[in-house]
Amino acid sequence: MQSHSKKRVCYYYDSDIGNYYYGQGHPMKPHRIRMTHNLLLNYGLYRKMEIYRPHKATADEMTKFHSDEYVRFLRSIRPDNMSEYNKQMQRFNVGEDCPVFDGLYEFCQLSAGGSVAAAVKLNKQASEICINWGGGLHHAKKSEASGFCYVNDIVLGILELLKYHQRVLYIDIDVHHGDGVEEAFYTTDRVMTVSFHKYGEYFPGTGDLRDIGAGKGKYYAVNIPLRDGMDDDAYESIFVPIISKVMETFQPAAVVLQCGADSLTGDRLGCFNLTVKGHGKCVEFVKKYNLPFLMVGGGGYTIRNVSRCWTYETSVALAVEIANELPYNDYFEYFGPDFKLHISPSNMTNQNTSEYLEKIKNRLFENLRMLPHAPGVQIQAIPEDAINDESDDEDKVDKDDRLPQSDKDKRIVPENEYSDSEDEGEGGRRDNRSYKGQRKRPRLDKDTNSNKASSETSSEIKDEKEKGDGADGEESTASNTNSNNNSNNKSDNDAGATANAGSGSGSGSGAGAKGAKENNI
């Protein structure tokens, strides 16, 4: 492992992403992605990387993993026609944690499009690190929404990476178990999933130490079940040795890191005690392996801390040091009273004793010893890329272009979007009963009003500062909106790999309980 610090970094962002609104009181706020973007612009980080507007993923791209019927449902459902879809909403688990809101399908298209385009960029060796903070929606299943996630952009990105890379490692540092990604690849030895998460009476209720994969995928699912209060030192003490052993044993050709920020201290739904620096150390450590590296977002419900975290981790990817003093930005008042980048841990007790963590580590090392070193994989003919960068449909944008007033007028922020009084953050009430932080779904559970933002706030988006929709000082090519994948051949041609998770959402202990089917992976 060498530490070559400077790498080519590509960053995917669409300025519309912050307009989507899950509804009053819902903890998931896509606006955090716009806050992150604005902060990294004002730090000047945009000058150091290529910035692309992602294409909107097509239905054909989404059905590389998701069922045709589920994607058709997502395309059709709207707040004004929900009454026509009552049975399907129940079947696809849409309506509570995963509400129907204006632009739902387009939101899914942008999230998935960024991760797929990033994977294509890595496959073409046009970048060493790609970032999509709008992705990381790790709970979505083949035919089911779950935990605020509708389309699993991570699975789609990994399937794209598998066209060129024999083995892909997925690492998840969200406070919640990465169940959707694990389930999708539970029976293959080409993808290893490693999830560090809170376990025990906590959503989604999966991710036991004994859940290790099935069939050819046995021992290729790695779960690190943690307790409340996980702090920086404890996290590093288990993350570094486990990822080191995984790298040595699995020898991946590419890595995907889900950077869920709900593992930070003070998160509205989380229960860990990590600082931004402690969270960022995971990015720093994985980066040192010099592998094609896809970084995606995920959870994070104290949104000022989410934007702090992802801005800092963008700087880590770029190997650029940034000041602790926050630059003035469009959301500056929400970072008070200190207006600093880094946050301090709370005084909560760390319930993860060194003995407990050592026991977990030793058990996982025993499992990893069962693996052959660098399993051989027969690579078939490489299918066409999901994105054709050289088509005439390229969306060329200039970083320093100012958007027209009509685009400004579309940007609306609901009242109280950032208010601590709405349960958010340090010192606020933490009434999470109706949300995933407190819900535990059955482990083998089978799938069985307009929320549009309505008013502008005084914190109107200032597009003059949004210079980041292109490459620095020159035009940057956005991904083509046309997919070249043929959905009729998707089962056979995804580099011999298609994730075929069963539609259930649970995870079993040991072999066979996932219901994932193997299909040439």
Swiss-Prot record:
Signal peptide start and end residues: none
Gene3D superfamilies, per database record: Histone deacetylase domain
Keywords: Chromatin regulator, Developmental protein, Hydrolase, Nucleus, Phosphoprotein, Repressor, Transcription, Transcription regulation
Family named by the database record: Belongs to the histone deacetylase family. HD type 1 subfamily.
Region (Histone deacetylase): 7-319
Region feature Disordered, mapped onto this chain: 376-521
Protein name according to UniProt: Histone deacetylase HDAC1
Entry annotated with the keyword Cell inner membrane: no
Function per UniProt: Catalyzes the deacetylation of lysine residues on the N-terminal part of the core histones (H2A, H2B, H3 and H4). Histone deacetylation may constitute a tag for epigenetic repression and plays an important role in transcriptional regulation, cell cycle progression and developmental events. For instance, deacetylation of histone H3 may be a prerequisite for the subsequent recruitment of the histone methyltransferase Su(var)3-9 to histones. Involved in position-effect variegation (PEV).
Domain of life: Eukaryota
Biased composition (Gly residues): 503-513
Biased composition (Low complexity): 476-502
Organism ancestry: Eukaryota, Metazoa, Ecdysozoa, Arthropoda, Hexapoda
Keyword Transcription regulation attributed: yes
Reaction catalyzed: N(6)-acetyl-L-lysyl-[histone] + H2O = L-lysyl-[histone] + acetate
Subunit: Component of a form of the Esc/E(z) complex present specifically during early embryogenesis which is composed of Caf1-55, esc, E(z), Su(z)12, Pcl and HDAC1. The Esc/E(z) complex may also associate with Pcl and HDAC1 during early embryogenesis. This complex is distinct from the PRC1 complex, which contains many other PcG proteins like Pc, Ph, Psc, Su(z)2. The 2 complexes however cooperate and interact together during the first 3 hours of development to establish PcG silencing. Interacts with the histone methyltransferase Su(var)3-9.
Catalytic site positions: 139
Pfam families: Hist_deacetyl
EC number(s) reported in the record: 3.5.1.98
Cellular component terms per the entry's GO annotation: chromatin; cytoplasm; ESC/E(Z) complex; histone deacetylase complex; Myb complex; nucleoplasm; nucleus; NuRD complex
Organism: Drosophila melanogaster
